[in-house]
Structure formats: C-alpha cells, structure tokens
Amino acid sequence: MRPVAPQRFAVYKSKPFARFARKARISDLDLWETARLANAGQIDADLGGGVIKQRIARGGEGKSGGSRSIILFRFRARAVFVYGFEKKNLGNIKSDELEAFRELADVILGYSDSEMAKRVADGALIEIQPPKGD
C-alpha cells in the first residue's frame, strides 16, 4: 500500500465575508490564526453539520468584545469563513440561518480541491495564504 500524502489545511473567505472583514479591520493573519486554533481543537462553539462559531481576535486586541464568525469547517482539511458579525450587534444566529449554513457546509465541504480552485478562480472564494513559516 502506498502512503497517502498529508492533506494541506486550506483557509478561505467568501466575498461577503471579505467585505465584513475589511470594514471590521480584521486581517488575513487574524483569520488564519482563528482557523488554526479551530484546527488545533480550540473551537468556541460547534454548531453541528460542519458549522462552527469562532471569536476573532484582531491584532493586539482580545476576543471577548470583538467579532464573531461562522465557519464551514472540516478538521485538517478546510475552513471557509462565510459570515461575520459584531457581538454588540448580534448575539446569535437564528435557527433558520443555522440550517442554511449547514446546507451550505454540506455542499462546500464536499467540494474536491479542483472544485475549490474553480470557486477561487471565479471569485466566489478567496484563499487565505498561511503566514511564512507555517
């Protein structure tokens, strides 16, 4: 049996999330670190069906009063930031929104690497590059 090469953990953001992150002054490095922590098992809230909620610490600030993110997540494979909000504006997402995120997770987390590359090429997703040395 041939050994299987380890899969690379990839991090993406949707175009709407990219707009939110820009307005909230959340850097790609902040997003990468948030996804890295989730991949290390430090998940703030597992909402089921491949959907997690993570607090985002902006450079130099803590997590408690800051932004929240909804991430489509598969351990050691992929994290896709799809929705962001400020804690002061929204405590939690509604159950119908959660169901829609779970359905989206079913689709996106099922994509092959080549399908993900197509989504990046057509501009639907933006791949976040790991920091140098990761």
Predicted regions mapped to residue ranges:
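Preference for short coil/turn "hinge" residues that link or interrupt alpha-helices
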Residues: 4-5, 19, 36-40, 78, ...
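Polybasic/polar functional segments that serve as interface/processing modules
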Residues: 1-6, 30-35, 58-60, 102
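Arg/Lys-rich, positively charged N-terminal/basic patches that mediate binding to nucleic acids
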Residues: 1-26, 118-134
